[in-house]
Structures are given as structure tokens and as C-alpha cells.
Amino acid sequence: MAEVEERILRIKQHRGVIGLLIVDENGKVLRTTMNKQDKEQNPIQIAKKVTELAKKARSVVRDIDPQNDLTFFRVRGRNKQEIMVAPDKNLYLIVLQRTDFDEN
């Protein structure tokens, strides 16, 4: 468990990271660094939508090559945010990150 905590802390310390979610295959939030009461970036809604997208992306990868599997994907929106997803067999690691931070 300490190893998981260390990794979460390390990810959170990256520049621009808004939040991190660990989600099960049904979109249930198991762990988050985000405020569950946030109406604009509600982690429960993010988890549901991103797991749906990840399942579709995994299906596309497998349709193209049945021997292959989705290991990571990133989506960048116009709002200068990225959603990065690392799917595993039963879990998804989702990281939200701002991309508009100052480069200096």
C-alpha cells in the first residue's frame, strides 16, 4: 500500500496535475485526489465517462489487431486540459492535467 501512496504522490507533484482517480471497470471511483463535491470537475462523472471511452478505445485497438491491447491514451480538450488514462485488467488510472501552465 505504501508503494501506491508513493506513486500517487509522485504523480500529483507533476506540474499542472489537477487530480488523479483510480477507478474500477464499472466506473466506480476507488480512490481520488479530487473534490467529490466539485460541480465543474466531478470525479464521479469523469470516472463514468472516461471508463466508457476507454472501453471503446480498447475495443477499437482489438478490432484492428486482436493480439494487441490498449495500454495508454491521452485526450486534450480546447480548455487546455488533458485526460490521461492507463487501463489495467480491472482498473483505470486517470490523471487530469492542465496544459496552460507557464513554461518558465
Feature map (PLM): residue ranges:
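Non-catalytic interaction/Regulatory regions outside core domains
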Residues: M1-N104
